[in-house]
Amino acid sequence: MPVSGRGFASGRFEVAKFEALAVIVSTGDVVWDVGAHYGYATLMTTRIVGPEGSVWSFEPSRLNRSYLKRHVAWNCSGRANVLPYALAERDGTEAFGGSDSSMALGLGRGDEEVEVRSISGMLDAGVPPPTVMKVDAEGSESRIVESLVRSEVRPVLMCAIHDQSQLELCTEALHQADYEVLPSGPIQKFLNDDSAWRGDPDIVALPRNDSRLRDRVSRTDLFRDVSAL
């Protein structure tokens, strides 16, 4: 898998996260990779979904998107679709950036102006409804979850959570939409120990009554022995 960027080509980039993501993606799925960065999840999920499925990669940063497009061209040209939008609860434009790290750029800060789209807006524009969403939005995840629950789609969701307030907002909205929310091991530890939040650990949200998928997720290293929120 040819990629640029130190650490990505080693096969050791966020191994536990991508093990869990691989469990929730199947042949024929429509995957939305929201906050695609350089495309590691895009490349992996494109291989899993095969020609029967599709991957739609959302990356608002011009610089990140240039690497993403390069990686798609090298590895899965014609099978992954790169879109220049941030997702949130409304359509419009917003400031974007606010960090020297390409992995920590977010809405509402920075010097770059980017296009923002709602999930319903993207569906109206002809993007096929997702069966799986992977989200890493640097603190805007609750806005994306709000957009999701306002829409008519109910995909399986894997979402990076950047602080406890985002966890509470996302969990409340997902419960209202009848999702079961599984915290990863690090989130469960933060909650059990009442310790300071660190990093961007994940949740997986499943439409209720999908016990088979829940069991598969619960056997991964990241979600083993956790209790639903």
Where are these regions (language model features)?
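Receiver (REC) domain switch-region micro-motif
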Residues: 31, 35, 133, 157
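Conserved residues at beta->alpha junctions
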Residues: 59, 139, 161
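Short internal loop-to-helix segment that lines adenine-nucleotide cofactor pockets
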Residues: 10-30, 90-152, 164-169, 173
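C-terminal substrate-binding/active-site "lid" region of AdoMet-derived donor-dependent transferases
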Residues: 165-187
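Conserved beta-strand signature within the Rossmann-like core of class I S-adenosyl-L-methionine
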Residues: 154-162
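S-adenosyl-L-methionine
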Residues: 1-71, 75-79, 110, 123-126, ...
